[in-house]
Structures are given as C-alpha cells and as structure tokens.
C-alpha cells in the first residue's frame, strides 16, 4: 500500500528550507511513501532543484498561493487565506487524495482550520494535541500540548476519553489509567476548572487515578495525563530545554581538560546513547486527536531532522491504522458526558450537539 501524505511546505519558522529537504530524505528511505508538497511552487521547486529531486516520482508539487504566517490570527487563516498551503493540504486529505497532513504551521490556525475542514469525531467538541512522552517502562500519553489554551471542565473530560481510546487502541489495554495534571495530588488543590474536571472524571467510567504532578510525567505513574494546552505546551518545552541543557553541560564538562577528553573517548558509546535518548528532535510530531482524519503537528522551530520525524509519525499512523483503531476504541469505550456531568452534580457545561461545526473562535486556540 502506498502511503500518501500532504506536507504543508510553507509552515513553521523556516518553511521550504526545512520541510522540502526533510520530505526528500524521507521518500528516499521509504519507497512506499508518496508526498504531496503543498505551497508556493517556485519556492518548492528551488529546494527540489538544489537537492536534485525535481524528477522524483514520489514527490508531487501542489501549488498554493497563500501562506499562514506564524503570527497570523486564527480569523485570517480561517476566513481570508483560503488558498493557503495549510488549507490546501487539509483539503486534499478531506477529498481522499491523501491519508494524513503534516504541518509545522501556527498551532491555533492549524487547529481551527483542521476542525473546520475535516470536522471532529462525534462527541468531541475540540481536537487536542497528543503525544507519547518516554518513561522508564514505555511511554505516557499526554494531552493537550498546545491546541487549546483555555479549557472548560468537559473539554478535559473529552481529552481523557480520547487519550483512553488511543492507548486502548495502540496498547490493547482495556482500562488505561488516567491522571489529571495539577499542582498537588489532593482533591482540594487546583483552580475551579481543575476541581470541576476532577469531579467529572471521578463520575465517569474511566480508570481515573486522581491528580498527578509535573514530576509524574516521566515516571510512568499513569498511562494518560490530561491538561489544558497552555500547561501542556509549557511542560513540553520546559522538558526539551532541560534535555538540551543537560547535553550541553555534559559536553562542556568532558571538554574541560585533556584527562576529561580521554574519559569522554572511553565513555563515548554511553554518551552517544544518552544523546540519542534525550534528543527532543526525534520526538517531534504530535497527533491532533479528535478529527475525522489524521493531522500531525510539528514544532514550528523544527529543523529538517526533526521535521522528518514528524513525517514519520504520520506515515506510521497510516500504516498502523491508528485513526480507524481510535474511532473503534472510542465507540467501544465511549463516556457519556451528560451522565458524567449529572453524576458530578452538574459541574461543567453540556457540549454542543455533534455535527455542528461553525467556524471556530480564535479564543479557543493559539500559536505554539
């Protein structure tokens, strides 16, 4: 089976100078992949020519006349730039020409345009960015990592349901454990949104283990950690910064003297394994969960190596039938929001009827 993906070549801080080289390298390593490079044709051609890939049959240029800038308001991306590389790439997925879209573009714009073009799964009000973060025994699924900076309690319940379904689909776990990210384990901790979300989660049929703290993220305390996009994005980027700092400190310490350099040579295999494990670029690419089609969000600051990993996330998701498995798991393990809210004493608000998809408000998301 040929895996067909659309690449928003103009998205991110670096645009085609990063996205096109990553795409070229990816198809050369994956002969069953076909990538549609969406964006300003002249800019894409210039990069392909430089890489001697203009005639590569695994790459197709799809012209788009507009670009969603990283600082564009959501309204501009959604209502004015209807021929942007982001929108055209998503339209190709909607029309069935591709199976997934990969973009490093403005997070808020990508969330809003994806939601408008592709629609959400039944019962899901807002998509969320989900990613598997490493822990000592495997990984912890965490969401939201930046799609929704302000959330209501029922949104956090929906994120938990999606995380539950994704882990159930990928790992075969019947009852994945769920934790709510908070400033303490006690029920009384947190703001009103977190407290009400905790009530909804305790009243649901999910395997909710209560509040977890930031130091639980990489311990593997629970299978799924739920938070709003503001907190999740800060936690993720703090982790990446810490990993980079540790690598820099080790490099600096081993370079201080001739003796330390000799010790570094002896420890080189261990150091290389350490460097690989903490290189956040290989963890680039997170799924925008809750949509009817696959969308992978790359960091806007990604280099070509990191963006290639984001492409691989989309490729692997298609090959493994993640979307279909997620939809089945959500149907099998669905949580009734109305019942949960009733049992929680009315905390939260009723979600809108499934199938109603007006153009989203800019207040629901932001650039990340």
UniProtKB/Swiss-Prot annotation:
InterPro entries to which the protein is assigned, alphabetical: FA_synthesis, Phospholipid_synth_PlsX-like
Top-level taxonomic group: Bacteria
Region of interest: Disordered: 337-368
Keywords for this protein: Cytoplasm, Lipid biosynthesis, Lipid metabolism, Phospholipid biosynthesis, Phospholipid metabolism, Transferase
GO cellular component labels: cytoplasm
Catalytic activity entry: a fatty acyl-[ACP] + phosphate = an acyl phosphate + holo-[ACP]
Pathway the protein contributes to: Lipid metabolism; phospholipid metabolism
Catalytic activity, EC: 2.3.1.274
Pfam families to which the protein is assigned, alphabetical: FA_synthesis
Entry keyword annotation includes Protease: no
Bias (Low complexity) ranges: 349-368
Compartments, as annotated in UniProt: Cytoplasm
Quaternary structure annotation from Swiss-Prot or TrEMBL: Homodimer. Probably interacts with PlsY.
Protein family (similarity comment): Belongs to the PlsX family.
Protein name: Phosphate acyltransferase
Native source species: Burkholderia lata (strain ATCC 17760 / DSM 23089 / LMG 22485 / NCIMB 9086 / R18194 / 383)
Gene: plsX
